[in-house]
């Protein structure tokens, strides 16, 4: 157990932050820097792996070969924190749904907080107790997690993303569906053929991403006995930063929209579909991540006047 032990800090290999002086000057903290060949695997109980770390790295292969458990930070949090937990995953919409749940559950009088992949590292909150922690979970987390024992797990959608890491869409689908492994209640998108059948419950998907997100939120609220009508839910509807933000409108009525949070084809397709009866010029860029662009290309052909890459 981590509880009752000395506070610890987590650092990565990027030289963004310097080690704080209280860490450097603490003589009780013993630091050993060794190479992989000098590592005694018999002394290792388990390894906490950053979700961004290369899962094909030699050290990961050696850990597997020696049958050493590899855990994510979210897995450690789930094991150590006694609060009720709601896991939210999907190719897109995770942050919106997580923050909506945080807001609505909090307004009901329960103490809730959204953490995880949305920019709030879970281990910063490991010693806090809430009525509910809503945890945004990425496929990178799921790939290295074996025991996400939560009260509710909801999977919003699955479309092509991160195939440069996961090697194939089939692998990506299996990793996403592993969210449900040990969840007491499992919820999936009824209209997404890539989400496994036989779950506890399903919500109605929609091509309109805002509508699908509200349906997902409504289903989670139902499972924790906080029923809320669609009309009431719409009052809470919002988007996180950089999701379909209108940042300028000129004298001719042309709108300039920042949707830089759309980092995969599925999210971009949803954004295009949400602009009904509009003339669209789309600017795209970034890493392909091994994705299949055929569906996005088809949608651009149907609805966009021009595309700038």
Where in the sequence are the language-model features?
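Conserved substrate/cofactor phosphate-moiety recognition/catalytic segment
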Residues: 112-129
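Residue-level signal for inorganic ion chemistry
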Residues: 2, 47, 70, 88, ...
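N-terminal leader/targeting and accessory segments in enzymes
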Residues: 1-72, 291, 302
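Walker A (P-loop) phosphate-binding motif
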Residues: 73-116
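Short beta-strand "acidic-cap" motif of Rossmann-like dinucleotide-binding folds
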Residues: 7-12, 113-114, 134
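Flexible active-site lid/hinge loop adjacent to a nucleotide/diphosphate
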Residues: 128-208
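Nucleotide phosphate-binding/pyrophosphate-handling subdomain across enzymes
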Residues: 210-304
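Short internal beta-strands
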Residues: 8-14, 187-190, 281-285, 303-309
């Amino acid at each position: 157990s981590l509880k009752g032990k000395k506070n610890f800090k987590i650092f990565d290999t990027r030289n963004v932050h310097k080690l704080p002086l209280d860490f450097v000057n603490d003589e009780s903290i013993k630091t050993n820097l060794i190479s992989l060949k000098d590592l005694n695997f018999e002394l290792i109980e388990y390894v906490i792996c950053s979700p961004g770390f290369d899962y094909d790295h030699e050290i990961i292969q050696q850990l597997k070969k020696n049958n050493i458990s590899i855990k994510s930070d979210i897995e450690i949090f789930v094991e150590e924190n006694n609060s009720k937990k709601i896991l939210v995953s999907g190719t897109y919409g995770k942050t919106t749904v997580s923050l909506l749940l945080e807001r609505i559950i909090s307004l009901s009088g329960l103490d809730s907080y959204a953490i995880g992949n949305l920019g709030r590292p879970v281990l910063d909150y490991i010693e806090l107790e809430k009525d509910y922690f809503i945890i945004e979970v990425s496929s990178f987390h799921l790939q290295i997690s074996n025991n996400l024992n939560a009260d509710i797990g909801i999977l919003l959608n699955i479309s092509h993303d991160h195939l440069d890491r996961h090697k194939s869409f089939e692998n990506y689908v299996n990793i996403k569906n592993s969210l449900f492994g040990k969840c007491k209640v499992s919820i999936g998108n009824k209209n997404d053929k890539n989400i496994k059948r036989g779950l506890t419950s399903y919500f109605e998907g929609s091509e309109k991403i805002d509508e699908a997100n509200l349906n997902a939120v409504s289903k989670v609220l139902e499972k924790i006995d906080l029923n809320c009508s669609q009309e009431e839910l719409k009052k809470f509807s919002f988007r996180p930063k950089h999701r379909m933000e209108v940042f300028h409108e000129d004298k001719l009525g042309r709108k300039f929209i920042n949707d830089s949070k759309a980092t995969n084809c599925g999210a971009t397709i949803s954004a295009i579909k949400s602009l009904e009866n509009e003339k669209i010029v789309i600017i795209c860029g970034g890493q392909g991540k091994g994705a299949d662009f055929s569906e996005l290309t088809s949608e651009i052909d149907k609805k966009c006047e021009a595309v700038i890459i």
